[in-house]
Each structure stands twice: as structure tokens, then as C-alpha cells.
């Protein structure tokens, strides 16, 4: 018995429905997989962008904190420098006051000859040259001439050699000088300043740390002390 046209049409419709269902299921499967992959990639992209944003703000936060530290350090340094300058200015004022009082020493005609002798001896012993040119204030010239022989004898007794000292009566120390002498040897190549100002500067270099401590207290940053 042959298959009727109706049966053939029915089988064809059944086959087409099956194929269509398979195609729809496959399309849905492909869509689902594509959506899953899209969501995964989208998640990765979102996470990557979130990480970049976090890194950006972390970097900015570190930069801001660094700037704060730099500003704080600069302010501390400026404050420290101002404090140090104020201290140095005060110390300079103390030394300037001492320097201004030097003239009172040479004005004391009872004490000054002994002080002048000490300055002259210090200069001669520091120099220890056989030929020396001596410069002093013009108003001290007579006093220097009086005490010089005694100083030369003392140098000779100690050194064993005699110094020939010529008082320079053409070139004098400045009238503004507080007093003392200046000694030259080897045609001026060697020069020793034994003036009151020079001695004050020498003493100031040695005692400045002690003066700072007396005025401002010990330095908290200093680990070792003399």
C-alpha cells in the first residue's frame, strides 16, 4: 500500500518542526553562551577599570601625603632657620658689645701697658723670626718703645736667639683699632696680628659653643660634648 500525499505532507511538517526546534535550541544555546562570555568579559573590564581607578586615587593620595610631608618639613626647616638666625644674631650682638668695650681696655692707662706687653710677647713667640717689623697705633708708639727691650730679652732667654724688631713709624694701625700690635717678617710675607680685636676673635671662636649653651641651653640634636 503506497503512502498518501497527506502522510508525506505530515512527515515533512514533522521533520521541519523538528529541524526548527533543533535550530531554535541551538540558537538559544549559542545566545546563552555568548551572553555568558559577554558577561565574563564585561566583568573583567569593569574589574580592570575599577582597579585602575583605585590605583589612580591611591597614587593621588600618596602624592598629596608626600606634598603634606614636604610642606611640613619645609615649615619646620624655615622655623628652625629663623630660630638659628635669631640665636646667631643675639650671639653677634653679645660679641659686638664685647668688641665695643675693647677700647675701654686701652683707655685704662694703668692696666693697658701690661696687656700690651702680653700681646707683644705672644706675637713674638708666635713669629720667632730674627728680623721683625712692628706696627702699632700712633698713640701707642712711645709705650711700645718702652716695653719692647724687656720683651726682646724675655724672648731671647726662652728662644735662645735674639729678634731684631723695628718699629714702623710710617705705617700705623688704624686709629679705630682698640690696641695691640701687628708683626711682619720676610718682607711682609709672614704677618701676625696680636691686636685686641684679633684676640677677641680667637677667643670668640673657642668659646662660641659655650656662649651658645649659656644663652640658649644645650643643643638637643648634639650627641657628643667636648
From Swiss-Prot:
One of its GO terms (molecular function) is proton-transporting ATPase activity, rotational mechanism. GO terms for cellular component: proton-transporting two-sector ATPase complex, catalytic domain. The keyword Membrane does not apply. It comes from the Eukaryota. Subunit of the V1 complex of vacuolar(H+)-ATPase (V-ATPase), a multisubunit enzyme composed of a peripheral complex (V1) that hydrolyzes ATP and a membrane integral complex (V0) that translocates protons. V-ATPase is responsible for acidifying and maintaining the pH of intracellular compartments and in some cell types, is targeted to the plasma membrane, where it is responsible for acidifying the extracellular environment. V-ATPase is a heteromultimeric enzyme made up of two complexes: the ATP-hydrolytic V1 complex and the proton translocation V0 complex. The V1 complex consists of three catalytic AB heterodimers that form a heterohexamer, three peripheral stalks each consisting of EG heterodimers, one central rotor including subunits D and F, and the regulatory subunits C and H. The proton translocation complex V0 consists of the proton transport subunit a, a ring of proteolipid subunits c9c'', rotary subunit d, subunits e and f, and the accessory subunits vah-19/Ac45 and vah-20/PRR. Belongs to the V-ATPase E subunit family. This is V-type proton ATPase subunit E. It comes from Heterodera schachtii.
